[in-house]
Amino acid sequence: MVQPALDTDRREEVRRHIHEFQVRFGDIDVLGHVNNCRYLTYLEDARVSMFRLDPLRQGTAPLKGLVVARHEIDYKRPLLLRPDPVRVETWVTELRAASFTLAYEIRDDEHVYVGASSVIVAYDLENTRARRLDEDEIALLEAYR
């Protein structure tokens, strides 16, 4: 089961990456809400934003290979087509030598629609095997812990 959102006191202590997006008509299924498969795309977009576009990354080397080893998603309430954007808040809950766990909330100011987590493994693309996270990667991840 996905770890519950941080309590209010602890939430203020953890820096979260914020990625806003607009629900698109094509995301909606025949039941009138966002299709469950689309949430994985929302999480992917948030990870790319965090690892490639985040201001903390300015002046640092690009992240090396990373692969997703596991996703877990708890659907809390339906997300409908709406004029206002929603956001994915992302933070690090666990950091190991060769992997880390990201937690996510897809939310607006009033509701959490999805809670999720992903285990990400550092990966040597050339040798096709897991590798250790380097100092720059650890520093970025620690900023969200």
Specify the residue positions occupied by each region the protein language model found.
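HotDog/MaoC-like acyl-thioester-processing domains
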Residues: 2-19, 80-82, 93-145
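Hydrophobic pocket/interface hotspot
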Residues: 31-32, 90, 128
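Catalytic strand-loop segment that frames the active site of acyl-thioester-processing enzymes
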Residues: 2-52
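A broad, structural micro-motif
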Residues: 34, 66-68, 113
